[in-house]
């Protein structure tokens, strides 16, 4: 990316490991951490990537800031994204799926929360076969989505967008797989 590194800092914030083993108590701690990020940015608009619709609903149901959240289903993505884009701050788009194909320039998105490292569902036969051929296959797919997520709010050299990762999977995943990221992305960590 030709954009200045300082305009898009990416950082991990200790929270909880977000995976199928996470307890309700841990997920409530995850919501609390996201609420802290939202609460400190009440004059801005942001996006929270949740990977799943179930996690998006859990967040919206338990967040102090649920009234500021724009949630969509697989059927009304474009409509809800448009409502969010037109909204005045504070506003938060909670989505598992606007990782590509959507731009949120300037004031449309000034912070992003990566709620979970975006690993693909690895239970299918095809992805299992590809993973057997290349042990980094799912990590590469996750990295590609993460890079796309982090870039939704930085669309020009003058854009500024903070990116927060609140999944403690990051602690082992980034050191192990950082070489899969483009160098310009690594420079922002």
Named regions from a protein language model:
Residues 56-62, 102-107, 174-177:
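A short acidic (Asp/Glu
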Residues 12-51:
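Conserved interdomain hinge at the start of the Helicase C-terminal
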Residues 40-47, 55, 65, 104-107, ...:
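Intrinsically disordered or highly flexible coil/loop and linker segments, enriched in small
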Residues 28-35, 57, 61, 78, ...:
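Feature representing long, continuous alpha-helical segments
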Residues 2-3, 14-22, 75-173:
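Conserved RecA-like P-loop NTPase helicase motor core
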Residues 172-189:
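Short, low-complexity, polybasic intrinsically disordered segments
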Residues 46-78:
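Conserved helicase motor "Helicase C" RecA-like lobe of SF1/SF2 P-loop NTPases
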Residues 1-9:
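Conserved P-loop NTPase catalytic core
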């Amino acid at each position: 990316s030709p954009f200045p590194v300082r305009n898009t800092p990416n950082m991990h914030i200790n929270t909880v490991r977000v995976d199928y083993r996470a307890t309700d108590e841990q997920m409530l701690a995850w919501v609390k951490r996201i609420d802290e990020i939202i609460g400190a940015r009440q004059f801005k608009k942001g996006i929270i990537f949740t990977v799943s619709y179930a996690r998006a609903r859990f967040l919206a149901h338990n967040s102090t800031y649920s009234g500021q959240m724009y949630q969509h289903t697989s059927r009304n993505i474009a409509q809800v994204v448009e409502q969010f884009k037109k909204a005045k701050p504070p506003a938060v788009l909670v989505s598992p799926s606007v990782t590509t194909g959507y731009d949120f320039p300037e004031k449309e998105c000034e912070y992003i929360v990566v709620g979970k490292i975006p690993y693909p569902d690895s239970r299918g036969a095809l992805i299992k076969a590809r993973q057997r051929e290349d042990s980094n296959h799912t990590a590469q797919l996750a990295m590609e989505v993460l890079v796309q997520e982090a870039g939704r709010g930085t669309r020009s050299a003058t854009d500024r967008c903070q990116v927060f990762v609140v999944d403690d999977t990051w602690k082992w995943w980034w050191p192990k797989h950082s070489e899969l990221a483009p160098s310009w992305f690594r420079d922002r960590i």
